[in-house]
């Protein structure tokens, strides 16, 4: 079996040893190399799962590909669910990439709730992870938010499971090719109308040509450093957030002068305080809050639909009446 090539992979061993094999799961099966490899991997690890395939009808071949996947799953004795949303031309919308993703995740969530699946396996690999990290760098993400995708994360209250994040794409393809396993070549993955495709087809090859080396591993290393930084920041932040109290105006975060000596941590504490109230603060907003705290001046600021009151010794998110 093709996945025997990875039977000594310690990260995979650790991942699967943490799973409850008595439960049943979903596998997002596109038919591409990544999800197909993951299908065989799950079979080899005795995971009980159902494959779900979403056929958007974007390609002339997609109907036949869905039928072929159904036949393959029947041959492999894997339960199979086929979903065909209302057809949409991928060229008609600038946001079709994100819209399709939202549709899939809502479908996965609904299936998990209706059929009692414990989580969804996704075939994201190391190259996908590197793309995610570089995209976040260019978007100006906080250093603590450059960790990329997590191997296990909750989507609402459904687990998203990504065991392949450390495995490069080429190793997955080599494993399938060496065993003559056919997989779908999705041409939309190369359609440069989509940002991910432009990064994959143009940006990454260009950067690797300029630097003369693979840039995936340094990006993954950056993600690891970011994850460690995030863990440290969360540990340092927790005691300050425990001091949050309700007063006559709303939620109050007391700020001590000692905290203000470390601007990086002070702004992170404020950022998490706002997030706990479902408010996303920009870097410029956090800097403004910090500046007022440092000078001891009072300010009333707007953050989405809420009023934030900054005073000499604290930050208040005012209640909505």
UniProtKB/Swiss-Prot annotation:
Record Pfam families: ATP_bind_3
Where are the bilayer-spanning segments? none
Where is it located?
Cytoplasm
Binding, ATP: 30-35
Main localization, broad class = cytoplasm
Class in the EC hierarchy, top level? ligase
Q: Among the record's GO biological process terms, what is one?
A: tRNA modification
Q: What is its EC number?
A: 6.3.4.19
Q: Which domain of life is it from?
A: Bacteria
Q: What is known of its domains?
A: The N-terminal region contains the highly conserved SGGXDS motif, predicted to be a P-loop motif involved in ATP binding.
UniProt function note? Ligates lysine onto the cytidine present at position 34 of the AUA codon-specific tRNA(Ile) that contains the anticodon CAU, in an ATP-dependent manner. Cytidine is converted to lysidine, thus changing the amino acid specificity of the tRNA from methionine to isoleucine.
Which family does the record claim for this protein? Belongs to the tRNA(Ile)-lysidine synthase family.
**Name of the protein this chain belongs to:** tRNA(Ile)-lysidine synthase
Q: What is the lineage of its organism?
A: Bacteria, Pseudomonadati, Chlamydiota, Chlamydiia, Chlamydiales
């Amino acid at each position: 079996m093709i996945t025997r090539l990875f039977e000594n992979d310690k990260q995979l061993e650790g991942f699967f040893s943490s799973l409850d094999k008595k439960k049943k799961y979903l596998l997002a099966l596109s038919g591409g190399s990544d999800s197909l490899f993951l299908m065989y991997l799950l079979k080899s690890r005795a995971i009980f799962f159902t494959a779900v395939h979403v056929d958007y009808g974007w390609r002339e071949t997609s109907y036949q590909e869905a039928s072929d996947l159904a036949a393959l799953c029947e041959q492999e004795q894997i339960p199979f669910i086929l979903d065909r949303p209302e057809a949409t031309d991928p060229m008609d919308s600038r946001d079709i990439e994100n819209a399709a993703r939202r549709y899939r995740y809502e479908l996965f969530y609904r299936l998990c709730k209706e059929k009692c699946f414990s989580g969804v396996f996704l075939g994201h690999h190391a190259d996908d992870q590197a793309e995610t990290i570089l995209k976040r760098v260019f978007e100006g993400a906080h250093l603590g938010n450059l960790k990329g995708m997590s191997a296990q994360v909750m989507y609402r209250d459904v687990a998203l499971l990504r065991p392949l994040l450390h495995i490069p794409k080429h190793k997955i393809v080599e494993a399938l090719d060496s065993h003559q396993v056919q997989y779908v070549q999705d041409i939309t993955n190369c359609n440069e109308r989509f940002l991910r495709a432009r990064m994959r087809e143009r940006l990454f090859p260009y950067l690797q040509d300029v630097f003369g080396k693979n840039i995936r591993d340094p990006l993954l290393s950056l993600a690891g450093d970011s994850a460690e930084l995030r863990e440290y920041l969360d540990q340092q932040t927790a005691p300050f957030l425990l001091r949050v109290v309700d007063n006559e105006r709303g939620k109050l975060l007391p700020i001590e002068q000692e905290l203000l000596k470390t601007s990086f941590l002070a702004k992170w504490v404020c950022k998490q305080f706002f997030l706990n109230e479902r408010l996303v603060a920009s870097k410029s907003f956090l800097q403004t809050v910090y500046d007022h705290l440092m000078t001891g001046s009072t300010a009333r600021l707007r953050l989405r639909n809420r009023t934030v009151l900054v005073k000499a010794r604290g930050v208040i998110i005012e209640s909505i009446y």
